[in-house]
Amino acid sequence: ACALTDPFARAESAKTPTADSHQQRSRLSHDAASRTRWNTSWDDRDETTDVTRIIWLVRHGQATEEKRGEDDGTRRLTNLGRAQAEATARRLGELLRGRRVHKMTHSTMARAEETANIIARFAFPSVRRESSHLLREGAPPRPEPDTWRQSEETHAEDAPRLESAFRSVFHRASTSEDRDRATASEERDRERHDIVVCHANVIRYFVLRALQLPPDAWLRLGLYNASVTRVEIRPDGGVSVRCLGDAGHLSPDQLTHN
């Protein structure tokens, strides 16, 4: 006589992962080639400090559409872009209430400068300001997969500039900054806060470089206009991204990408 069996039970058991299959998948996803090693001396600084740097990366608000033959650096904020920047200013003011912002640096492109002006006006009227051409929008190293398809000349020109921008912004606090903080009685928690207002490609590249992840993955990340990214650099050289492209302060009808 033939034994009666449930075909659905056989199919279900075939789908059920076993301990061996879990181990095999673990080996495939955590093999030596896929692992990274953290370089604690990534910023070439060996000074002793107890100050944690907190960098607030802000993408500019929505800008006017890009037109063929027009200088990309002259594009200004739309009315919506200005409203986005104001909302971001108020959000940063809430997050940094009671803390001193050491400096706000912005790209020399009009849309980033205008965003920084709004942030200063509504939240940090006395903050020290700087502008940097290194922070202008550009083409980081060629992305993988390469769906952007910029010319090799564009990447060759922009990638070194963006790397210079990263090195100028991302590093541990110096001992002189530590001493400055020791005299600032209003400061709390041994933190130094810096705001950087720039562009999507720049921020995406910065985040991957700061985390020592493959920078060619930058195009896989997406950032809303006027979004906020928070990166912490600890005295031991450790780096953490506490939020990436946060746009919770914007209403749904204010969410844009361009």
Where are these regions (language model features)?
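A conserved hydrophobic position in a structured secondary element of the catalytic/binding core
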Residues: 58, 198, 223
